[in-house]
Amino acid sequence: AACKCDDEGPDIRTAPLTGTVDLGSCNAGWEKCASYYTIIADCCRKKK
């Protein structure tokens, strides 16, 4: 599933980005979004 993190949650490494939901660890009720374009870019956003 695609995800966007430019305005949905605290940025971990870089923003804005569009990518896919990753199974990485974020706080409860949040999900990790990993960028399409670079492995090191990801962020946490609130689950919808």
UniProtKB/Swiss-Prot annotation:
Subcellular location: Secreted; Nematocyst
GO cellular component: extracellular region; nematocyst
SUPFAM superfamilies in UniProt: Defensin-like (SSF57392)
GO biological process: regulation of signal transduction
Molecular-function GO terms, alphabetical: sodium channel regulator activity; toxin activity
InterPro entries: Anenome_toxin (IPR000693), Myo_ane_neurotoxin_sf (IPR023355)
Keywords tagged on the record: Disulfide bond, Ion channel impairing toxin, Nematocyst, Neurotoxin, Secreted, Toxin, Voltage-gated sodium channel impairing toxin
UniProt entry tagged with the keyword Transport: no
Domain of life according to the entry: Eukaryota
Disulfide bridge map: 3-43, 5-33, 26-44
Keyword Secreted: yes
Family to which this protein belongs: Belongs to the sea anemone sodium channel inhibitory toxin family. Type II subfamily.
Task of the protein: Binds specifically to voltage-gated sodium channels (Nav), thereby delaying their inactivation during signal transduction. Is highly toxic to crabs (by intrahemocoelic injection), but without effect upon mice (by intraperitoneal injection).
Protein name: Delta-stichotoxin-She1a
Taxon lineage: Eukaryota, Metazoa, Cnidaria, Anthozoa, Hexacorallia
